[in-house]
Amino acid sequence: MSSWITGLADKAENILNKLDQNAATALQTENATGSADPMRRSMTSSTQSLSTSLKSTLSPVRRSGANSSSSVKSDGGVSVVTKDMRQKMTTSASFSNSPDISANSMDTNELAAFKIALNEITAERDELRLRLEDLNNETEKFDLHQHTQVLEALVKSLSEERDKAVHDYNEAQAANMAYVHSISELETNLAKLQQEYISAAHKLQMQTKETEQQRQELQEYRIKAQRALQAKDSLIAELKAKPTEEGADPNLVSKDSETRFLQIEHESLKQELEHANEELQKARLQLDDYVSQERQRQVELSSARQREETLAKELRQAREHSVTSESDQRVLTQELASLRQQLSNQMAAAATRLQEREQQLQQMRQRLSEEANTGAKSDYETRLKALTQSLVERQSLLERVTSERNALRLQHEKAQTQLQQNMHLVEMESQRGSSRHTMLNSTDDVKAQFPLLMHPSPFDNRVARRFKRALRQADSMGIRVGTFLRRYPMMRVSVIVYVALLHLWVMFVLLSTTPN
């Protein structure tokens, strides 16, 4: 929009220059009849070109007027100026094109009126330029405001992302600690289960061996009993086949008694065989129980192995995460070292420039003290003011650099604390045990603030310089003591306890002693 308005102003200026040239040529010509026609033609052509240029330039300006309030105001001003210019140019054109005016009646009064109109047009042109400059300033301010808003939104989004990343990192660290603890517990449980499984397998083997031995003994006993029973059954059958007669000899009676005794033994052996069969059934049931228990132990062992595999996978992932965090930490430390190197180089360059400026300032002061000319003194005073201003700017730049150095130093300390924490976590994962560790205080955000009264100025005397130097040294010592106490909480507590004991001792001395 500003380019269109500048184009409009340039076209109006060109047209006015043409009108001035035509008026000058008309005044120089002596023949009025010959000069009226080209003057009329030039004025009509200039008015037509001005109207066309105004229309062509105002149309995009009016279209862009709906975008912002500032553009609307500028279009209003431009439209008013263009209306005035049109009216004046139409009056001048009608004045030139009127049929009543002839070539003989144009005189110096009309030319003077034409010059007055030209002067008014030039004044309006200047006013249009001023409005154009104001409009450009407003547009620049508006662009700067929009740019600042965009930057503020970007800073806010970046701060939110940083907070979110810190929160995610803390959550991941807590989850990692929980995983390490659970892994250690599961490993202990797995070792216990393995020991129990080994002991149960050993017991099962012993019991299977005992059952096999008992089974073999039972089979041998069964075979022997069956043989004895078969022999006795055959003997009983023979005795039954040959019954004894009455009045038989006593040998047969003794044999009958032996057969009865053998029958009794046969019945007892049958009972023992039944008892042995019952014991064999019990042993079989126990063997089945042992087999089922062994199957259950195998199922538990397979589940424990699956758990062990999952835990091993989680442990690998945790180790990979720790390795990535260590690599990120190394990259951050390298970047921090490079930034510190750049900062030290900038500080050295600024210090050398400051020394050069101070030397130049001293040379200028010597020259001012030597010379007595007032004009030279005023010139030197202006130079001295410029040098002092540049010196103040250099000092402010040096202060900014020192503040950035302190911020980078704090970032370095935070990175070191994070690196120590990550190394401690890696050691805990390698040892597979939980151990407590103390974290350093990373809230050391002290920034060196330099009061305005302590700034050295070139107009200070020696006493003021020494006093300000002493104040700066005392301020730096106080800042160092404050950072030391913030960084080490035990020293802070010890100092507080020492001050409290000192006050108690002083109160005890004051209350216990009596005046003479």
Curated annotation (Swiss-Prot):
Residues 1-492 are cytoplasmic. The keyword Transmembrane applies. It comes from the Eukaryota. Residues 42-80 have a biased composition (Low complexity). One of its GO terms (cellular component) is Golgi membrane. The chain crosses the membrane at residues 493-513. The modification Phosphoserine is found at S64, S74. Keywords: Coiled coil, Golgi apparatus, Membrane, Phosphoprotein, Transmembrane, Transmembrane helix. GO terms for biological process: Golgi organization; Golgi vesicle transport; intra-Golgi vesicle-mediated transport; retrograde transport, vesicle recycling within Golgi; vesicle tethering to Golgi. GO terms for molecular function: cargo receptor activity; protein homodimerization activity; small GTPase binding. Its main location: Golgi. It is found in: Golgi apparatus membrane. Residues 28-80 are annotated as: Disordered. Residues 514-516 are lumenal. It is a single-pass type IV membrane protein. InterPro entries: Golgin_subfamily_A_member_5. The keyword Membrane applies. Residues 108-423 form a coiled coil. PANTHER family: GOLGIN SUBFAMILY A MEMBER 5, GOLGIN-84. May be involved in maintaining Golgi structure and in intra-Golgi transport. This is Golgin-84. It comes from Drosophila melanogaster (Fruit fly). The gene is Golgin84.
